Amino acid sequence: MFALLKDRLSDLDDLLLHDDSPKEAWALISDEKIMRRVIARELRRTANSLYTVDQEVVTADEKETDIRLRSALSKHEAVIELKLGNAKRSAKELLDTIEGQLVRKYMAAEHCKAGALLLTLAEDRQWQHPVEKRLIKADELLSLLIAQADRAQQVLGGGTYICVHLLDLRQ
């Protein structure tokens, strides 16, 4: 499921490169619920009967995952935690999302061993580095998030996979 998840996130990037891309329309979305719907619709469109797509599925501890891909061929699942990069979230909040939401809450199920933090970015912005307190841009934030995901994945051991994907909606 992890390979399929990563492929589908890459497909979103490819979609944004087409001349009939929804990039400009998606960049105008400032509500996470609406963004979740358009991304889920696109993931559903490209499913090819390999998986089903659920939105806001409630987990055993009453937490809601943003998007869940369920394999049509096995019990395996992958979860996507969506965050709008232009919202007022700090770099620390985004880093904490990996462990606090994605790993502990959404990937706790036995058959859910693949997860992604999907961060959209509609315009340039900066975040305060969580340790050094200096301002950083999207590329450095992405590096910090990937490193955090790698650490979380190592702690969980083999068979659990986490990625971070930046969906760049900037003009």
Where are these regions (language model features)?
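Domain-level recognition of nuclease-like catalytic cores that cleave nucleotide substrates
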Residues: T120-Q171
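Active-site metal-binding core of divalent-cation-utilizing nuclease and nuclease-like domains
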Residues: L50-S74
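Conserved catalytic cores of phosphodiester-cleaving nucleases, focusing on short active-site segments
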Residues: I67-L69, A78-N86
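Feature representing long, continuous alpha-helical segments
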Residues: K33, R37, R41, E77, ...
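Catalytic cores of nucleic-acid endonucleases
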Residues: L84-H129
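Acidic-basic catalytic patches of nuclease active cores, encompassing PD-(D/E)XK
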Residues: D14-D54
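Short, contiguous acidic/charged loop-to-helix segments that flank catalytic cores in large enzymes
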Residues: K23-S30, Q55-T59, N86-D96, K133-I136
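Intrinsically disordered, low-complexity, repeat-rich regions
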Residues: M1-L17
